[in-house]
Design a protein with these regions (language model features):
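Generic alpha-helical transmembrane segments of integral inner-membrane proteins
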Residues: 18, 22, 26, 30, ...
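Transmembrane alpha-helix boundary and packing residues in multipass membrane permease domains
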Residues: 17, 21, 32-33, 69, ...
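Transmembrane helical elements of multi-pass membrane transporters/channels
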Residues: 12-28, 132, 166, 199-203, ...
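Short runs within selected transmembrane alpha-helices of multi-pass transporters and secretion channels
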Residues: 64, 133-152, 159-170, 192-207, ...
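Interfacial/gating helices of multi-pass transporter permease domains
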Residues: 35-54, 120-125, 189-190, 231-239, ...
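Short alpha-helical transmembrane segments in multi-pass integral membrane proteins
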Residues: 1-17, 71-136, 186-241, 297-363, ...
Length: 448
């Protein structure tokens, strides 16, 4: 594939994915912006409550990205029956996980918040939000599965349209429900949760509406689920289970990081939530690159074009370095501008937010490279077992222990706790580069 064809295919996938990620990330930022006027406790409470949603979505992400490894290779040879089976399996697993998370979050919202903090105001705000927001979990799981299938089969614009609809609805309903407009009572954090529920319903409605008119691998009667043969499940679990385990334990690691930040204090927690929301906006380009990388490499390997896959992997690695440096520098050098989005935060949280963004901008460079290596190259090449071992070891043997020691034992300020957590990325980038250039990451899963 020449350079022009490479970039055309990359942008065709990356731009819709990046735009969808931008809207999704801005939804989270919008929630934080609106809630910021309610005080530090509300920001911290909603941020900690969303750790449950974060863990849940990462498990769903694992199910769907693991499935997309098979999607890409089988779609590369247009094996529609296998693609349908993969879609069935991912929908079934995502639904089961979402129901479990929904019931736990609805039944024990305040107990979950108390695992992070003993601040009564934070627990109250977070618990109130979590009990209502849990209603979105099943809907979100379906949106993830259907959107992932559409992207992997060459239709990234459909989930983008659905997310745009959700974004507009969330902004509108959040505004009227949080602050009590159009004759409605002001509901605060509960209003933010209700706004999210309505937005998710609209998103899944758009997806289902389009899919009913889409002649392809998504039109599958539910009764076909029982016809999936044992041989398929063997291949499916071999590829997807490492990704599911990877994302689950990586997400748990992020939850532990937030627990460490909460040890520093409520203002530190609020500042971290704001900084993470801002960085989430910057990370959308990386998500687009990662999706392009995984799908393009998977399709090339499925077609047995191994040399093309190797060459494209190197191109994506170079792009990740350039992207990380440019965006990381902007993030580090402009915190005073990005924090203007949050006009009602306390001076202490504002100062901490500036310091955190400067530090996180540097770490962002490594996060970008690692995302392309793990999510793009290793998963696109079917090297999911190695990716799992790499991420789990770096999170649980490096990042989590250091951050907990920094906050709970050494009592360091939150900026240094974030740096300790960032040691995960330093370790990962060294080992990840070695794996990519060993060329042991290429695994062809399609049987001719």
């Amino acid at each position: 594939m020449n350079s022009k064809a490479f970039y055309q295919q990359m942008f065709a996938i990356a731009i819709p994915v990046a735009l969808q990620s931008l809207l999704t990330s801005f939804l989270n930022t919008l929630d934080t912006m609106m809630i910021s006027s309610l005080g530090d406790a509300s920001i911290a409470g909603v941020g900690l409550a969303n750790q449950v949603f974060f863990l849940f979505t990462l498990i769903c992400f694992g199910i769907n990205t693991g499935s997309s490894v098979l999607f890409a290779q089988y779609w590369g040879v247009r094996d529609v029956p296998q693609v349908r089976k993969i879609n069935q399996a991912s929908l079934m697993l995502s639904t089961a996980i979402s129901v479990a998370f929904m019931f736990v979050a609805m039944l024990f919202p305040y107990g979950i918040l108390e695992l992070f903090t003993k601040d009564a105001a934070v627990v109250q705000a977070g618990g109130d939000y979590l009990r209502v927001a849990a209603l979105t979990y099943v809907i979100t799981a379906w949106s993830f599965s259907l959107g992932s299938t559409l992207r992997s089969t060459g239709n990234p614009k459909v989930p983008l349209v659905a997310t745009m609809s959700s974004f507009v609805a969330n902004a509108f309903f959040n505004y009227i429900l949080i602050f009590g407009k159009l004759g409605l009572p002001a509901m605060g954090v509960v209003g933010a949760a209700l706004g999210t529920v309505v937005a998710r319903l609209i998103e899944i409605g758009v997806l289902v509406f389009v899919i009913k008119r889409y002649q392809g691998p998504l039109q599958i009667p539910i009764r076909h689920l029982q016809k999936i043969p044992k041989e398929f499940w063997t291949v499916y679990w071999k590829t997807t289970l490492p990704v599911i385990v990877n994302e689950t334990f990586w997400a748990l690691g992020q939850v532990f990081y937030n627990a460490a930040y909460a040890m520093v204090g409520t203002q530190a927690t609020a500042a971290v939530q704001i900084a993470v929301a801002i960085q989430g906006l910057a990370f959308v380009i990386v998500r687009g690159l990662g999706s392009s990388c995984s799908i393009m490499l998977g399709q090339s390997i499925g077609k047995n074009k191994i040399d093309r896959a190797k060459k494209d992997a190197n191109r994506f690695i170079i792009l990740s370095i350039i992207t990380g440096v440019v965006i990381g520098a902007i993030e580090s050098l402009t915190p005073q501008w990005t924090l203007l989005l949050f006009g009602h935060i306390s001076p202490e949280v504002y100062t901490l937010g500036q310091q955190l963004l400067q530090v996180m901008g540097v770490i962002f460079i490594l996060k970008t490279i690692n995302s392309i290596i793990v999510v793009g190259v290793l998963r696109g090449g079917g090297d999911t077992h190695y990716g799992m071992k790499l991420e789990m070891s770096c999170v649980w043997l490096v990042g989590v222990p250091l951050s907990l020691l920094a906050a709970g034992v050494w009592h360091l300020p939150v900026t240094l706790v974030v740096i300790c957590a960032g040691m995960e990325e330093v370790t990962k980038v060294v080992v990840g580069f070695y794996r990519v250039y060993s060329q042991k990451w290429i695994h062809r899963l399609v049987q001719d």
